[in-house]
Amino acid sequence: MRTRITALITGLVLSTAIGLSAQSLPPGKTVTDNGPRTYRFTVEYTNANTKGDIFRRQRLTGDYTRGLPAGDVTWKNVVQQDADGATAPFGAAQKRDFMEGFRYHNDLAATLKPEFFKAFPPAAVFERNLVWDTGMIEDFGQGHFDRLKLNVPLHAGSSDDVTMPGVGVFHNRDIVLEWIGSSQRNGQDCALIQFQAFLNPVEIVNAGITLKGLSNYWGQIWVSTATKQIEYATINETVVGDLKLAGQDTTMTINVIRSGVLEPVTVK
């Protein structure tokens, strides 16, 4: 009888331990970089008026490699394609030579320093976004990994003004991260992390163009529980605001919809 009771208690303890383990992610893990790993980042911009009429589309694609010596990352093969209207095919790819081999230490805070993009043309906002978005995705997926609990929202930042040198100011009202479940990508068991931030004031002043409006952004990140590597990520954003072009006195209300996918080209 005593043996049966002991076995029952042991079973309950193990069951409880397994249940608690399932509610939190592995603590104290660092990102495992077994050499360079390249990702393809594709982002599409759709520009529309208040009636939903699409008048311009842009697509940016670039190869981002992390895991280089000294914690460096680099960009190659960054191109932009443009199209008018909702259905016209994208035009020829325009190479962004100033980003070919662009290498820096993987530090998101450093990318917000005024001198960081000194080799970029002043109007290269989309290209700057590639750098900021990858840094943000890695920060959300890896930097807050230990703090996440299953189905428990984590408020990672609020009332935070981000000064984007040469571009403008973005105010994060409330960044919410949430570990919403488990999945698989590239043969890896992954934590699926959702991020969102709504009603964020944004003001852009760049190359004679001004835009004042509100941004809503959200997405999902698949993070390997074994290596803490990003295995897949999405980002979506809408910006509605008043746009004033250089040399014009009137403004127009514009709706910019942005969608992006970050996925590994080389699987670890």
Predicted features and spans:
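Positively charged n-region of N-terminal signal peptides that target proteins for export
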Residues: 1-5
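Short helix-onset patch at the extreme N-terminus, typifying the N->h transition
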Residues: 6-8, 234
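Bacterial N-terminal signal peptides
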Residues: 9-19
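Signature of exported/secreted
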Residues: 23-268
